[in-house]
Amino acid sequence: MTPSPPPITYISIPLPTNDVVSRSIHNLTTAISSHRPWSELIFSGDFSLPESFSSLLLRSKTNFNYFFVNYTIIVSTCAAFALITASPVALIVVGAIIALWLIFHFFREDPLILWSFQVGDRTVLLFLVLASVWAIWFTNSAVNLAVGVSVGLLLCIIHAVFRNSDELFLEEDDAINGGLIGSNLR
């Protein structure tokens, strides 16, 4: 009997903080660039009332999945406009906190290294939560931020409910079955 080889494991090589931030920013720009064309969101497709409640749910789910990045941009823009009305300082502070969340939590792939120590995910999350609470308290912008996000969500929900999603295809199989593209398999 031969001894079994040791299991193959993935070992993460710590990267400097600059590399972590630049990779996170690259991931963020890649995610934002995956939005659907704005003309497709607004002008193409007809708007109508859903025929039934199940049709409403299906239409909403399809539109939310298809236009997710666009809807995120709309909600973020409404929140930014609400913060501008509060004060420019609030917009800058909350914008900086949102940038920290995007870079250090949502789009970070590698461990964060500060002063030759690896910072754990829970520590990063705790710091981001505390910084967010401090920023909202410091700028007194909780109400304005809630109003802006609510208006953005309301706009997205209205669009998702009334935009006909019959011609939207989320996957290639759906496009083939719907007759949008032909299949080479015969």
Curated annotation (Swiss-Prot):
Its main location: endoplasmic reticulum. The chain crosses the membrane at residues 66-86, 87-107, 119-139, 142-162. It is a multi-pass membrane protein. This is PRA1 family protein G2. GO terms for cellular component: endoplasmic reticulum; endoplasmic reticulum membrane. May be involved in both secretory and endocytic intracellular trafficking in the endosomal/prevacuolar compartments. The keyword Transmembrane helix applies. Keywords: Endoplasmic reticulum, Membrane, Transmembrane, Transmembrane helix, Transport. Belongs to the PRA1 family. It is found in: Endoplasmic reticulum membrane. Signal peptide: none annotated. The gene is PRA1G2. One of its GO terms (biological process) is vesicle-mediated transport. Expressed in roots and trichomes. It comes from Arabidopsis thaliana (Mouse-ear cress).
